[in-house]
């Protein structure tokens, strides 16, 4: 991704922070979207403050936990384990693998990591706005491989810290739960990402845990006009569907852009919608993985932020 210093606020920002017109003016003349729209009172935040990382290089999972995942999304299984070294040693973690098995695995890993990094960039911009007095963070997963000698040696999973107090706030088809303040904040965040990206993206399918000092999200979907973020990226039709069902709330700004004549192309559902996926559905046992190291007897672990 290309970066450039804004001619007005002197911040080093990615191309997503500029409109196409401003970016075309070249270095030394381009002004970011925040400056163009009069929002210059923005304190820069390091993206590292937004990303919640493993901070470990090893974890362990029981065979029982892997053969009987404690959670499942629309297309992933989730098993709970524990970090065994690093600054998160002893803390709970999760590994995730795809229900389609190995058919689309490599492609899914790549787009998952790209979407997660894009989410970090977009959420960092939200945090810089200081529209609320809490931080929004997002788990940044890594692809880990199981040890040799284990039952599924060499198999790969997405590894990230465990999230407690889990709930879903919106989906990638316009569904949202506006019953609690944090859910309305998440709707505003989704709207903001469209504005700050110049109408190119909407961050949605927001889910995670509420903590004392903020929210931690996981598995976000990035909708893009270029449809570059995998099978959950429903493209321009997904973006239009979001706004067809979105009602601005107290956390939105009247200055944020919205598409004109938004139409709904999808039925709003709480689950994650995918398109154009070759499916070879697998039960947990068939795609489960052995521990990264010698499995331990799992207990009811506490979660950490």
Question: Where are the language model's segments positioned?
Answer:
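Short metal-coordination and nucleic-acid-contact micro-motifs, chiefly zinc-binding Cys/His arrays
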Residues: 2, 28, 74
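Short cysteine-rich clusters marking metal-coordination/redox-active sites
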Residues: 6-9, 32-35
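Cys/His-rich microdomains that often coordinate metals
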Residues: 13, 17, 39
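Short linker/helix segments within small regulatory modules
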Residues: 18-30
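ATP-binding glycine-rich phosphate-binding loop
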Residues: 41-90
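Conserved structural core of kinase catalytic domains
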Residues: 89-183, 215-240, 244, 248-253
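Catalytic activation segment of kinase domains across protein kinase-like and atypical kinase folds
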Residues: 159, 182-281
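Acidic, Ser/Thr-interspersed intrinsically disordered low-complexity regions
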Residues: 294-305
């Amino acid at each position: 991704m290309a970066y450039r210093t804004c001619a007005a606020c002197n911040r080093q920002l990615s191309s997503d922070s500029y409109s196409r017109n401003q970016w075309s003016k070249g270095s030394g003349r381009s002004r970011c979207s925040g400056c163009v729209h009069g929002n210059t009172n923005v304190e820069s935040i390091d993206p590292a403050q937004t990303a919640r990382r493993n901070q470990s290089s090893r974890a362990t999972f029981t065979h029982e936990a892997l053969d009987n995942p404690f959670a499942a999304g629309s297309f992933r299984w989730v098993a709970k384990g524990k970090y065994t070294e690093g600054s998160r040693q002893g803390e709970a973690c999760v590994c995730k693998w795809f229900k389609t098995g190995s058919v689309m695995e490599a492609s899914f890993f790549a787009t998952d990591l790209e979407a997660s990094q894009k989410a970090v960039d977009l959420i960092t911009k939200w945090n810089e706005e200081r529209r609320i007095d809490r931080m929004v963070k997002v788990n940044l997963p890594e692809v880990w491989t199981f040890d040799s000698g284990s039952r599924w040696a060499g198999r790969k999973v997405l590894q990230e810290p465990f999230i407690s107090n889990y709930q879903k706030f919106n989906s990638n088809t316009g569904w949202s739960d506006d019953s609690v303040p944090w859910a309305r904040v998440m709707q505003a965040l989704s709207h903001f990402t469209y504005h700050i990206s110049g109408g190119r993206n909407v961050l949605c399918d927001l889910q995670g845990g509420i903590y004392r000092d903020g929210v931690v999200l996981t598995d976000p979907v990035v909708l893009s006009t270029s449809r570059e973020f995998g099978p959950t990226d429903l493209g321009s039709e997904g973006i239009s569907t979001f706004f067809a069902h979105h009602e601005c709330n107290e956390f939105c700004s009247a200055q944020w852009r919205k598409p004109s004549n938004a139409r709904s192309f999808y039925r709003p559902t709480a689950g994650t919608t995918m398109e154009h996926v070759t499916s070879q559905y697998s039960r947990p046992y068939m795609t489960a993985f052995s521990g990264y190291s010698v499995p331990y007897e799992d207990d009811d672990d506490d979660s950490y932020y």
